[in-house]
């Protein structure tokens, strides 16, 4: 049977080869010339075409004035100031859920008087795609989840009683999830468009929305018990599927953190973090790091992070965010050990 199959394949190959070697050059039996068509493409020599998820990202706060897009920096090699927005591939807005959704059914991107609306319109005018991360945890910051969600009965922790607006919502709470689902659906109605949106940073839980220090216990934000691993996996699966359901045309990303979804913020990588990253990817996500260039072994970009990037390299896009950048001294004298050149 194997010899018969080999013979058939060989015969098919020889037949194809003999056809390919025909003396007929396409001119027909009389050997006439084939009429040609001259094509003259209309080239656009001025507009820059950016590949998706390539290039530099311009960070913009949701409370900035649109004039921020006119910010210039001096480039020594050019010997002149240049407008940063002209060299950016995306505009990254990391902001609060409460800013984007101040009241139930009200959205800042629909309010012409809001700064968010004005920033979005300016970015679109500049043809600068937007990226969002929506932060819900109020620790270190303030009222990140809208008050109407808590008024409806959503559970929360308050780890800093002297700052009553710094509430931490419980992401497994059904009331929280109901309002968050409504918000994500509305966000997608406006921004599920690759012409205007570069990517959505679709997790946003934990401190600063970075995916670590995620609390599941309203009495103790650092509590870890026998149910923690199950709950954090269920929450990550819920939120990534939620974004994937509504954002079908733009990339979704998640921070590949060593303690992703865990109540802690640093230390040895959690044994389940790798599988959580894989779960997010299976739900349609790409990955990004918030700590690129930070070489601290407990919370920076170290062995575990490099291994995750190597594992998924060439399989999904990987976005890097440079960690804190020095401003008071030279990069090359920084303890982080940046390499020059």
Give the location of each predicted region.
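Active-site groove signature of glycoside hydrolases
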Residues: 155-222
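Catalytic-core regions of glycoside hydrolase
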Residues: 36-75, 87, 124, 128, ...
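Short, charge-rich amphipathic segments
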Residues: 34-47, 110-120, 129, 157-175
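Bacterial Sec-dependent N-terminal signal peptides
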Residues: 14-38
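Sec-dependent bacterial lipoprotein signal peptides
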Residues: 1-19
């Amino acid at each position: 049977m194997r010899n018969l199959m080999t013979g058939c394949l060989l015969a098919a190959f020889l037949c194809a080869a003999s056809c390919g070697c025909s003396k007929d050059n396409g001119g027909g039996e009389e050997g006439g010339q084939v009429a040609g068509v001259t094509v003259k493409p209309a080239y656009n020599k001025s507009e820059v075409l950016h590949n998706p998820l390539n290039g530099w990202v311009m960070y913009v706060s949701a409370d900035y004035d649109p004039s921020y897009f006119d910010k210039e920096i001096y480039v020594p090699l050019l010997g002149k100031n240049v407008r940063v927005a002209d060299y950016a591939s995306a505009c990254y807005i990391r902001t609060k859920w409460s800013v984007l959704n101040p009241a139930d059914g009200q959205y800042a991107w629909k309010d012409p008087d809001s700064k968010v609306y004005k920033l979005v319109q300016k970015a679109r005018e500049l043809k600068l795609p937007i990226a969002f991360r929506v932060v819900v945890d109020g620790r270190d910051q303030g009222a990140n989840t809208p008050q109407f969600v808590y008024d409806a009965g959503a559970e929360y922790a308050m780890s800093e009683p002297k700052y009553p607006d710094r509430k931490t919502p419980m992401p497994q709470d059904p009331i929280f999830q109901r309002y968050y689902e409504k918000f994500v659906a509305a966000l997608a109605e406006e921004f599920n468009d690759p012409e205007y949106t570069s990517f959505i940073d679709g997790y946003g839980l934990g401190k600063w929305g970075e995916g670590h220090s995620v609390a599941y216990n309203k009495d103790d934000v650092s509590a870890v018990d026998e149910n923690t691993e199950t709950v954090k996996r269920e929450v990550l699966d819920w939120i990534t599927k939620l974004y994937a359901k509504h954002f079908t045309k733009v990339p979704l990303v998640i921070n590949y953190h060593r303690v992703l979804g865990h109540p802690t913020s640093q230390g040895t990588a959690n044994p389940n973090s790798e599988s959580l990253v894989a779960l997010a990817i299976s739900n349609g996500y790409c990955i990004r790091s918030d700590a690129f260039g930070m070489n601290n072994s407990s919370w920076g970009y170290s062995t575990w992070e490099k291994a995750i990037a190597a594992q998924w390299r060439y399989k999904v896009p990987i976005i890097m965010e440079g960690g804190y950048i020095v401003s008071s001294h030279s990069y090359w004298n920084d303890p982080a050990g940046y390499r020059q050149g």
